[in-house]
Amino acid sequence: MRIAGVNLPLNKHAVIALTHVYGIGKTSARNILERAGIDPAKKIAEMSDEEAHAIREIIAEEYKVEGQARGLQQLAVKRLMDIGCYRGLRHRRSLPVRGQRTQTNARTRKGKRKTVAGKKKAVKK
C-alpha cells in the first residue's frame, strides 16, 4: 500500500508502518489511526481500501510529509544561516550545532579526517 509516495511494509502493524513516511512518528501515527477508527495493531496487508483512503485523507489534510516536510526543514536551517546566529554559523561550518565537543569525536558531522603531517624525527648519528 502506498501513502504519500511511500510503499508501506505489508507485514508490519499500521502504527509502525506509518512511521516509514517522513514527517510521521509514532505519536502522529497513533493519532491518525485513532481518527480513522483503525486498530493500531492491524497489519497493513489486512486493511481495506476504505481504511487506506481514510488514512490518506487525514494525512493530506493535516500533515506535512515527505518532500514538504524536508523542504520546511531545509528552510529552517537556511533561515538560521541567513540571520547569522550561532546555530546558523555551526551549520555553515558543518560542525555540531548542539554544544557537543569537537576536539575529539564529532566525526559524523565533520567528515573524514584531514591528516596533517607531523614533525619529522631527526636522524641520530
Swiss-Prot record:
Basic residues bias located where? 107-125
Any one annotated GO CC term = small ribosomal subunit
Q: Does the keyword Acetylation apply?
A: no
Keywords assigned: Ribonucleoprotein, Ribosomal protein, RNA-binding, rRNA-binding, tRNA-binding
Per its record, what are the GO molecular function terms?
Answer: rRNA binding; structural constituent of ribosome; tRNA binding
Q: Which residues cross the membrane?
A: none
Q: Does the keyword Ribonucleoprotein apply?
A: yes
May I ask which residue range the UniProt record assigns to the signal sequence?
A: none
Q: Which GO biological process categories is it annotated with?
A: translation
The UniProt entry's sequence similarity note says: Belongs to the universal ribosomal protein uS13 family.
Q: What does this protein do?
A: Located at the top of the head of the 30S subunit, it contacts several helices of the 16S rRNA. In the 70S ribosome it contacts the 23S rRNA (bridge B1a) and protein L5 of the 50S subunit (bridge B1b), connecting the 2 subunits; these bridges are implicated in subunit movement. Contacts the tRNAs in the A and P-sites.
Q: How does it assemble?
A: Part of the 30S ribosomal subunit. Forms a loose heterodimer with protein S19. Forms two bridges to the 50S subunit in the 70S ribosome.
From the Swiss-Prot or TrEMBL record, give the protein name. Small ribosomal subunit protein uS13
The major lineage groups are: Bacteria, Pseudomonadati, Chlorobiota, Chlorobiia, Chlorobiales
